[in-house]
Amino acid sequence: MKLNLITISLATLVAASAFPAHAGPQAHVVCGYHHTLGDDAIMMFGKANQAMWHDFFGNTHTDAVSTYQTLRAQPDTTCDNKADSSAYWAPSMKLPDGEIVNPAYQKTYYQSTNVAQYPLHPFPAGLELLAGDHHGTGPSSAITFLCANGKGYTNKVGEICGLRKAGDAVQFNIGIAFPNCWDGVNLKPTHTHNNAIYADHGKCSADYPVKIPTVNMNIAWVLPQISSLDTSKVELSMDPVMHGETREERWGSLYTAHADFMNGWTEDGAQFMTDLCMNQGLDCGTAVPYAYSKAEENTWVSSEDDKPHASVDTLYVQDDWTNGERTQHPETLTLVKFKIPPLPANMDASLFKYRIRLFGGKTETNGADQIFFYPTSSDWHASSVSWNNKPAINYRSDAVLYLNHSHEYRMVDVDKAVRKALAEGKTEISWYIGGDRQGNHYDFMPADSKQSLVLMLTGFKKTPEL
């Protein structure tokens, strides 16, 4: 049996009617269907094969005894972003002709609104959420339906889905928007207590004060075996009547649609999603890292200013190599040092990549140029390094960044250099950021700024959206 969430006020739910068009801060994952079980580790923990039939996405080991700890210990996932080993599940679907069909995939958008006034908090480790009502008899603003050839999302049943295009398949989607205000105490809902409710215009109540990203789960069924689908005749699995170990199956209308979410994001991933992505109003797409580290030290040194700059609010870069005369012109270099996030021991390392994310741009408006990331040692400190005592610089760059005057977030691929450092047993890595060799100026935000300066470890493998 599931907790009835229909009593939660949904009048203020934002963007449930068409969440893929959300224009605010967000990130997303695509997770393929993996398996079907009569299990529900949130509301029927330990009772294998006694729940309704559920289709599972994400973590491939989800069953009746799954927890955050088991998800992270066995993180294999069908999700494209390998920072997300969450478990997602929803009831199985039966077509009007009686065929029980598997979904193709689900795409979840993590979204929010009004983050400037009411910022988000990361998902706590172990958080479990429910959405929808498995006894529902009418429309809910948390549940939406889509025929891929139709007029967009609706919360009413009855549309006839046709082929997406001639000679193709019928596609039917169900969207489920989860509550986004946690009570701050209970990681797990119970039959008598909702551990989360919906925000009111982005604001959480005193009883549920912790604002978290809205989990907008969008499940897609792709059905090439039919040419039309009457959604009023589609059914979803309900809890069976158990006769000992024998199941007597029950089915309900689409209004019984609901879903479960068991957080399995890495703690770094959950933290980055809120603090360095959504709270800054960004759409980060799939660029939420498995792990990351802020620059533990960053500064700049100048040939015209032989002084340390222990505390900086801007990082500067400029050099001029024209006519082969680098040393005859002023030169300003930024120095950055990072702890290296280790590669996961229990996942395919080939799916992962190290990248630097930094915010900044060129001062001049004379077009785009490339700047260079030069390797150096990590035996320096921002409090004491200056031009004349700086570590040696190797002008054979590890990476280049092509950029113009627009000040924005930028990604730099440093994967080869970081893996080499790891192979050498290093736990830290440093670079100089050098200019375009044409005399132009560049500036970037340091690690302790709102935009920060981070070394990211991202893992990704594309999940097909059929």
Locate the predicted segments by residue.
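Primary mode marks residue(s) on the alpha4-beta5-alpha5 output face of response regulator receiver
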Residues: 24-51, 55-176, 184-288
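Flexible, small-residue-rich N-terminal segments that precede or flank a structured functional core
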Residues: 287-343, 375-378, 437-438, 448-452, ...
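Short, surface-exposed ligand- or partner-binding patches at beta-edge/loop junctions that are enriched
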Residues: 353, 424-435
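A short beta-strand element within beta-rich, extracytoplasmic domains
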Residues: 336-338, 348-363
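Short beta-strand-plus-loop segments that form exposed binding edges in beta-rich domains
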Residues: 432-446
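Gram-negative bacterial Sec-dependent N-terminal signal peptides
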Residues: 1-22
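Beta-strand-rich interaction/scaffold domains
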Residues: 361-427
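Extracellular/lumenal carbohydrate-interaction signature centered on repeated Trp-anchored short motifs
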Residues: 328-330, 342-352, 421-424
